[in-house]
């Protein structure tokens, strides 16, 4: 196995020292590509299978069947069609552009995405707790944030039940398990 194929090591990003592009934009684009590719690598052959819920599978399903999606307006469908055309039907490139808008604009409460892509990104690429608390006052995000909070609390409850069962059986929580719990609690 090549070192670049190992999934259990930390990610490393390299950026040029001299560049004409804004470094923040470059980092956001790189993180979007990284999120897409790491999800593909973790999911394996099921990265595009909607039965296995993941960032890539839901986003591919959304882009493949946008014409039949009743949640999208005619204008949103036309924008997505143009985005797919500009990206030469490369779903990753469309995702990266949406991810850039998500981080740069939507995190500040400025609407750039349609309802479906916003919902997918909130599920798999949520904002920090501070940003989520700021956005709760915004009516466009209230439903999404409430749904996210419910899903998070269910995950925490499920993890705590497994951990309690593990402790009762004589197990001891190591640092990785505690970090995992902290991740779901944020």
Q: Where are these predicted regions, by residue range?
A:
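Active-site-flanking segments in enzyme catalytic domains
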Residues: 4-186
